[in-house]
Amino acid sequence: MDVIEATEGTTTFLVPVQDSTGQFPPGTAPVFFNRRMELNRDATVLLLSVLQPSDYLDAMGATGVRGLRVAHEVGIPVTINDRDPEAIPLIRENVARLGLPVTVTCRDACSLLFEQAFDAVDIDPFGTPAPFTDAGIRGTRRFLLLTATDTAPLCGAHLKAGIRRYFARPGNTGYHGEVGLRILLGFVARETVKYDRGIEPLFCFAREHFVRLNLRLTRGPKAADRTIERLGFILQCPTCAYREELPGMFPPAATCPFCGKPLRPIGPLFLGAISSDEILGQMQARLPSCGLGTQKELEKLLTTCREELPTSSHYDYHRVAQQLVVSPPKIETLLEALRSAGFDASRTHYSGTGVKTNAPLPVLYDAIRGKNEP
């Protein structure tokens, strides 16, 4: 296997040479490594430096980069696992080069997690984490970290695949990125509560090509009940921008109060807050000292997530303006107009044209048209 050196954060490691002319270069190497996931890995290192779990499992290590970085930059006991025998020599070589006390195993991830528990478990498969979620929950003492890259099924572009994998109906809406994140959160919640455990989102976010969940798992029937109380549906009008949030497991038939069209249920999904402001604040305070390559991007993400309203959906206000046949205002003008009208409003990390607000739809329409400018 031909390898080259790469560096992320303060960690230097070996990765396989990729064919840069391929349609998806990471898939051309014998062992998988995706450079575009550096932000994801940086966020993991930063979060774990705050949480300080007693040990950590990188359940699907591939090159082992994520686990290597956690061991080297966070300084906690790490196990790196991969079921591919071809990946193990490279992981071991990287461990030896760094002189790290890391345990390396070659196991099926589910089998390992059924037999052994870790304080923090990281599941980062190629595609959907759904087949590994139950084992991940059973093998996690406190912190469960999940990545999904099957954004098309999660966001409703591949509807039947989304229903099969997550037992939920996605929605290909103007806020499909948030739908995907909340569908995945809802799925993990339902898998967790059957063990009389609950979930507490610490830092969950979505990018163009992946969704990342960082969760604290809590114990007891009451914790499970609190999680169930945060599950429900979004009822979306197929014609206009109207939607409403509906807690509970069984959505009734409803019609849009503006169009009269039947509302389409999206879910079940997670309706609660997707991050902990306390944890995000601690991550921001620690960020400048971590030497991360995506520091500026991560700082922007953390700031936006802290300011983002906890509502369960957002508006792509450019898309709404197109429906209204008007030119969209500047986003700050729109936010100020909504606030001046007495409502909360914020940007969203999902999209540069995403706006969250608790304003009724007519107020949002007027603000986009410029009728209630401050």
UniProtKB/Swiss-Prot annotation:
Family per record: Belongs to the class I-like SAM-binding methyltransferase superfamily. Trm1 family.
Name this protein carries in UniProt: tRNA (guanine(26)-N(2))-dimethyltransferase
Molecular-function GO term, any one: tRNA (guanine(26)-N2)-dimethyltransferase activity
Function noted in UniProt: Dimethylates a single guanine residue at position 26 of a number of tRNAs using S-adenosyl-L-methionine as donor of the methyl groups.
EC number: 2.1.1.216
Species: Methanoregula boonei (strain DSM 21154 / JCM 14090 / 6A8)
Pfam families: TRM (PF02005)
Chain positions recorded as Zn(2+) binding sites: 237, 240, 256, 259
Domain Trm1 methyltransferase: 4-368
InterPro entries registered for this protein in UniProt: SAM-dependent_MTases_sf (IPR029063), Trm1 (IPR002905), TRM1_arc_bac (IPR022923), tRNA_met_Trm1_C (IPR042296)
PROSITE patterns, per database record: SAM_MT_TRM1 (PS51626)
Entry's Gene Ontology BP terms: tRNA N2-guanine methylation
Entry keyword NADP: no
Record keywords, A-Z: Metal-binding, Methyltransferase, RNA-binding, S-adenosyl-L-methionine, Transferase, tRNA processing, tRNA-binding, Zinc
CDD domains in UniProt: AdoMet_MTases (cd02440)
Binding locations of S-adenosyl-L-methionine: 41, 66, 82, 108-109
Catalytic activity of the protein: guanosine(26) in tRNA + 2 S-adenosyl-L-methionine = N(2)-dimethylguanosine(26) in tRNA + 2 S-adenosyl-L-homocysteine + 2 H(+)
